[in-house]
Every structure is written in C-alpha cells, then in structure tokens.
C-alpha cells in the first residue's frame, strides 16, 4: 500500500519538526538537502526512531553515494523500507567530471552494497550540456548492471548548461535513440521517458544553437577547469569539439 502521508525534510532545519511518534507504515520521510548519509542530524533522527521502535515508515535518501560509513550502514539496516536515490549524471569519468569530488567506481560499489543489504535503489539524473551526447552510455550500463532500477530525470533548462543547447544535434539525436532502446527508458521512473522524448523531439526539429549561452558555458567551465586542474577534452571530447561554434 503506498504511503498516504509525507513528511518532508529537505535540510537540517526541518528534521526536528518531524513527529517521530506519529510515524507508521503509511508515513514517508524524504531527506534531500545536503548529504544525508553523513549529516549528524540525520544520524540522530534515525537513532531516535530506533529508540522509539519507529522504523517501518518509508525512508528515502537522496545521495551522491560516495560516503557510507560502517556506523551509517549498521544504523540504516534497522529501517526495512529504505530507498536510496543515487545522483548519477553520466557514465564513468563523465559523472566524475560533472559532479566533481565523486568517484564512479566507489559509487557503483556502494550501490551494490546497499542492494545486497536489501535496500531499494533509484537513479536521479540531470540531462544537460555535459551528458546530452553520451547519456546512452549511462542508460546502457544501468540496463545491464541494475536492470530493475528506476530512473528519475530532471532536465537542466539553465540557458548556459541546457540540454537543449548543444550544437552537435546529430550526436544528441543518436544518443537519445540509443536511450530509447533500453529497458530503463520504459521504467516507471518520474519523467524518464518524457524527458528523453522532449530532448529528442527538440533536436529533430533543427533547433538553432544560442551561441551567447554556449560562450557563457565555456567561459564558466574554463574557470572550473583552471581551479580543478582538469581539461574538458580529457573527459568529454565531443563537448570540447563544440567550442568551435562559439567563433562562428
């Protein structure tokens, strides 16, 4: 039976507002803000729930999946209805580049660990200019390695990072077509199919690239590369190849 009551906890300020005594099998608690797997406030909340024997509610944690301490894993094992929404915005080094500070291999290792402990997994992905030409690589990987996993898409509409402003439209169309061939595309994830369809339909209609926004993207990303000591071409060469369109 789906939960009929939602308790929303986007950040540390609202955790104390959760009425633990009222939590039951119909309740749902969702931790989104920050990184809940390392937040002391979330740890204290779970400990209080455990002390009151209130652990059978639906619990969702949105996480980058990088840091899972032994203490956290032992604590979360007491909550049988837990879903981890893992943020993955690309396959392998594409994800590590866009989500600087993450470690693809570690994240995948942790996803397998969480599944082995009986927790459910979903994937949260943001299509944007970084991954719109290669998103199929992530879809195909998840299809093969985590076939029962739902994906939630939140398309990036920011003009300078937009999934709808890549000048290499043929690469985008090809990637979207490959996404459509996966089982993940037909999963019950929120906006997965409709998100891919919207990107595909946009590019097959010969859109005109907003060059000013593309220039803004490269100016921003070049600053990031200088600060991080990275080079875009080493991670997403087709995006670096799009730079030439800024001088036309």
Task: Give, region by region, the residue ranges found by the protein language model.
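Core AdoMet radical
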Residues: 1-13, 23-40, 52-69, 77-108, ...
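Arginine residue identity/basic-tract feature
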Residues: 5, 43, 48, 67, ...
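Short, well-ordered amphipathic alpha-helices
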Residues: 14-16, 42-50, 107-112, 139-143
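Conserved alpha-helix/loop element of class I SAM-dependent methyltransferases that forms part
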Residues: 18-20
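Distinct, well-ordered alpha-helical segments
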Residues: 41-47, 70-76, 134-138
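Hydrophobic helix-cap positions at the C-terminus of alpha-helices
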Residues: 49-52, 75-76, 114-117, 145
């Amino acid at each position: 039976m789906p939960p009929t009551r939602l308790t929303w906890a986007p950040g540390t300020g609202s955790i104390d507002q959760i009425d633990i005594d009222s939590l039951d099998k119909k309740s749902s608690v969702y931790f989104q803000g920050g990184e809940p797997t390392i937040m002391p406030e979330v740890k204290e909340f779970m400990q209080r729930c455990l002390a009151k024997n209130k652990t059978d509610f639906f619990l969702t944690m949105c996480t980058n999946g990088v840091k899972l301490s032994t203490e956290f894993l032992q604590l979360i094992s007491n909550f049988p209805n837990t879903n981890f929404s893992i943020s993955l915005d690309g396959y392998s080094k594409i994800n590590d580049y866009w989500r600087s500070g993450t470690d693809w291999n570690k994240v995948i290792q942790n996803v397998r660990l969480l599944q082995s402990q009986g927790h459910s997994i979903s994937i949260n992905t943001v299509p944007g200019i970084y991954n719109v030409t290669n998103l199929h690589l992530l879809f195909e990987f998840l299809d093969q390695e985590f076939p029962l996993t739902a994906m939630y898409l939140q398309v990036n509409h920011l003009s300078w990072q937009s999934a709808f402003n890549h000048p290499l439209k043929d690469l985008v169309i090809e990637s979207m077509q490959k996404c459509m061939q996966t089982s993940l595309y037909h999963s019950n994830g929120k906006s997965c199919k409709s998100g891919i369809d919207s990107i595909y339909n946009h590019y097959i209609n010969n859109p005109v690239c907003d060059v000013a926004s593309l220039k803004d993207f490269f100016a921003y990303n070049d600053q990031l590369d200088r600060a991080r000591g990275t080079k875009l071409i080493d991670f997403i060469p087709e995006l670096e190849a799009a730079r030439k369109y800024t001088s036309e």
